[in-house]
Amino acid sequence: MRRLSLWWLLSRVCLLLPPPCALVLAGVPSSSSHPQPCQILKRIGHAVRVGAVHLQPWTTAPRAASRAQEGGRAGAQRDDPESGTWRPPAPSQGARWLGSALHGRGPPGSRKLGEGAGAETLWPRDALLFAVENLNRVEGLLPYNLSLEVVMAIEAGLGDLPLMPFSSPSSPWSSDPFSFLQSVCHTVVVQGVSALLAFPQSQGEMMELDLVSSVLHIPVLSIVRHEFPRESQNPLHLQLSLENSLSSDADVTVSILTMNNWYNFSLLLCQEDWNITDFLLLTENNSKFHLESVINITANLSSTKDLLSFLQVQMDNIRNSTPTMVMFGCDMDSIRQIFEMSTQFGLSPPELHWVLGDSQNVEELRTEGLPLGLIAHGKTTQSVFEYYVQDAMELVARAVATATMIQPELALLPSTMNCMDVKTTNLTSGQYLSRFLANTTFRGLSGSIKVKGSTIISSENNFFIWNLQHDPMGKPMWTRLGSWQGGRIVMDSGIWPEQAQRHKTHFQHPNKLHLRVVTLIEHPFVFTREVDDEGLCPAGQLCLDPMTNDSSMLDRLFSSLHSSNDTVPIKFKKCCYGYCIDLLEQLAEDMNFDFDLYIVGDGKYGAWKNGHWTGLVGDLLSGTANMAVTSFSINTARSQVIDFTSPFFSTSLGILVRTRDTAAPIGAFMWPLHWTMWLGIFVALHITAIFLTLYEWKSPFGMTPKGRNRNKVFSFSSALNVCYALLFGRTAAIKPPKCWTGRFLMNLWAIFCMFCLSTYTANLAAVMVGEKIYEELSGIHDPKLHHPSQGFRFGTVRESSAEDYVRQSFPEMHEYMRRYNVPATPDGVQYLKNDPEKLDAFIMDKALLDYEVSIDADCKLLTVGKPFAIEGYGIGLPPNSPLTSNISELISQYKSHGFMDVLHDKWYKVVPCGKRSFAVTETLQMGIKHFSGLFVLLCIGFGLSILTTIGEHIVHRLLLPRIKNKSKLQYWLHTSQRFHRALNTSFVEEKQPRSKTKRVEKSRWRRWTCKTEGDSELSLFPRSNLGPQQLMVWNTSNLSHDNQRKYIFNDEEGQNQLGTQAHQDIPLPQRRRELPASLTTNGKADSLNVTRSSVIQELSELEKQIQVIRQELQLAVSRKTELEEYQKTNRTCES
């Protein structure tokens, strides 16, 4: 107990001493391993609460036009003025970005503070909520798994319901300091807050906050637009100013001049009212600096001619006296214009050193029109309002965390929760916490956070210094020379312009650290390709693949490689490139070291085997390699023997399977459309056929017996024939409807069929290939892995982190899968893709599996299940390597600056397999297995046709006789014309007109022959050749050609002559083509009980036939008389 009391006393004393004493507390047992104060955590609800007051929105004023930039911050959801209640804000662009703000990436579209073409509204409530959300995701920020909560004051000015009788919406709730104090007590303090965050906008509000902190003994952090002067130095009231101090630019510029010994300088001002007071004070206080002249071109910028003449005069005056020119208040367009004119007078570097005194936006720096050697400074990211709010909240959290490890009760339990009963103890919780606030420093989003004096929180941004130089290809590029940190310049690798100028004749490269780096081929982190004919690498890094880890052998190979007489066999040389090679090159550039690269001899990551470490770990431990750069997983076993940097890539383990195309089933041709669609199509088809039939039979112009003397009838079977022909697009002869309504409906049905058929055709190819199936695994805990059935094979890479994880977590599973493990990742992928496959599942790092899936041209690979065993890739180093911390710090910078994101996009932005599916469908060939269902359907159709034929015979022999006996079922013309004829026609009725036709033919085909003297012969031909159908009742042919007669007679000289005499017959009535006796002109059949109308019609037809026969008889008798007279005349002549 006495020992603990001494340590407690030492900790209390250190609180009163400067910050270095805080380091002593790191070794205090009671501070480093304090037991969890369960009762205290229960009382505070496992949360640290921070109050918030003065939450009225801010409206920022625009800056000068020359510094204005476009941008905008998405507004959050406002409070509802009608309901009087506050609602949580909707996520905005800044909100969504703040989730990644801890990694240093700027929010897309966020406007920088103090910039913008116009006024901008800032919402403290939104910033507080998002700050709490982000900080609660940071692991280890608060001890004992505590979380941050924000308690916001109720303010009538924002539409909240006033809770106090002294506050009203018509007047500001903080107009009276005492009322403000009471309001804070009743709405914020009573909930037990450790500190208050405020957003005052006036000096009066600052005084109110001074009063609150003094009376309630609660730390108050005020975030202000600009620093307010204060008479009292209240350590409980701190203020953080958002306004960037101009002295920072002045300090950086002066340090640049001092480092290069550029003490004689001149100033060039593009804006006369630009504030350079701080810069002038710093140079005047240093006796080494001498200001030659000040060139003010503000009045001449508008006219190029005036600017040219003015610069010519001024440059002539300083040509020989001033080696350095510092520019202030110039935008990039003005700078380019000035440099173009200066070049005409020969004043470009190195004759004149140009320095930009104002902080520049690094993203806007360009190289066009700027001279080599130009020096600029600026920040890679600009601070936004949310940065400062989150940094203030993080300052409180860090102070509470540090204080909790010393005295948890005093740090976590607020002393003031009732304003009416303020405790007057010697040390309140607020006073205790304020001491830690003053001694807390950290690197925040807005800059380096620390407390200056006792009341000012400073946020110093790190400036980077850039120089325009030539890249290795000879092109101009901005090169980083160093950074401004903690009030001084920290140089990076490289050489400053003045140093290069002094040593350009006898410059010697400094000695660089030379490292031997081992790697392992793993796509996309490391690729290899063959070298060219000369043994060099046009792209990538030259590496050796000696297939050994013998250190002496590697020494000889690299020694020969660097000698003038290179004798390394060409088979050992490779060109290495990829994600990790780019990272290695960047590290070498930033840390100023050279390296030799080789591929690990055994191709293993490293595992403890046969009493020693293999692979990459073995090379690091044996001293063969100084660094291992590849997809090197950080696990417990490796971390115990070698050093790892902070992870540069986060991943997990995953499971890779192969998809298989199943054979298309018999009914696959039906799959393009759902069964409900097929049902709907055929229902709509028959409904359409019914309506087509109804429209045709109800129309006066339809193809029906009541129509306009139609020779055909449109029945329901005709409608079905039309609908099916349009649906399947067959070009068979159809009987289209004649009425307008029917044709319109038929065209609508054609449009419907066109869209259905197009949809079916578009989906047919994708469906015909069959469904893709794969092994469905839920993850590492899937029963198929723990209890594999016979024939299920899965494995991983030997001596990898995946195998180590399975060995430690699931020994039985590891024992089963050992027989299926493969040497490398490509082997496992190939085993999956083989036909037949040698593996059913492959377990490996998901980062590697995702890449294999993305480059799979056959689209057969797929990752399944939930990821497991979260891990990271790090750079391996020998134990206790001095490079570990430096490389880890650079990797953290690469993450915050977005360099790692660039690498990820470069090597992982591959076209996904899903978007390349068109390349597969273009060459898709379908075999008979894909159309087996259609052949089956055709065979079924043949069988149904045979059954239909049998059915026709059954109907004809059995059903028709029965229906004929029923007089009510004789009319079927609207349904089927053939069925109707079959019911209404008999054999006897068809036989009578046939016999009659034959008798008429015989009577019409007659021939008379008369022989005269001289063996003459008179032949009488019939007037026409009438076919067998021309004497039928319904014959419609005319007999106009039956009016010519041929005669053979002798002239008066007794010579036989042939003559033709035209004889006009008596016109015959028009006759129609005869149809079967049981049919009328429009195809209607007579019933057995003939109606009166049909009898009259038949009598009229018979009368016409009799008239025709009578006329023919008269003609025959007349002709007979003529012939008889002619015969008598001849006889008289002979006598």
UniProtKB/Swiss-Prot annotation:
| Residue ranges of the region described as GIT1-binding | 1082-1115
Q: What reaction(s) does this enzyme catalyze? A: Ca(2+)(in) = Ca(2+)(out); Na(+)(in) = Na(+)(out)
* Region described as PPP2CB binding site: spans on this chain: 951-987
Example of a GO cellular component annotation carried by this entry: plasma membrane
Cytoplasm among the record's keywords? no
Q: Which residues form the signal peptide?
A: 1-23
Q: Quote the Pfam families the UniProt record gives.
A: ANF_receptor, Lig_chan, Lig_chan-Glu_bd
Q: Does the keyword Protein biosynthesis apply?
A: no
Which residues of this UniProt protein bind D-serine?
A: S633, R638, S801, A802, D845
The record's keywords, sorted A to Z, are: Calcium, Cell membrane, Coiled coil, Disulfide bond, Glycoprotein, Ion channel, Ion transport, Ligand-gated ion channel, Magnesium, Membrane, Postsynaptic cell membrane, Receptor, Signal, Synapse, Transmembrane, Transmembrane helix, Transport
- Residues modified by carbohydrate are N145, N264, N275, N285, N296, N300, N426, N439, N549, N565, N886
Q: How is its activity regulated?
A: Excitatory glycine receptors are inhibited by D-serine at a concentrion of 10uM.
What sections of the sequence does the record tag as coiled-coil?
1080-1129
Q: Where does glycine bind?
A: S631, S633, R638, S801, D845
Which residue stretches are annotated as topological domain Cytoplasmic?
695-715, 728-741, 949-1135
Ranges for region Disordered? 60-117
Its membrane topology is listed as: Multi-pass membrane protein
All disulfide bonds of the chain are C537-C575, C543-C576, C859-C913
| UniProt PTM | N-glycosylated.
**Topological region Extracellular:** 24-674, 762-932
Per its database record, what is this protein's job? Component of a non-conventional N-methyl-D-aspartate (NMDA) receptors (NMDARs) that function as heterotetrameric, ligand-gated cation channels with low calcium permeability and low voltage-dependent block by Mg(2+). During the development of neural circuits, participates in the synaptic refinement period, restricting spine maturation and growth. Forms glutamatergic receptor complexes with GluN1 and GluN2 subunits which are activated by glycine binding to the GluN1 and GluN3 subunits and L-glutamate binding to GluN2 subunits.
PANTHER family in UniProt:
IONOTROPIC GLUTAMATE RECEPTOR (PTHR18966)
Family, as annotated = Belongs to the glutamate-gated ion channel (TC 1.A.10.1) family. NR3A/GRIN3A subfamily.
Protein name as it appears in the record: Glutamate receptor ionotropic, NMDA 3A
Naturally occurring in which organism (per UniProt): Rattus norvegicus (Rat)
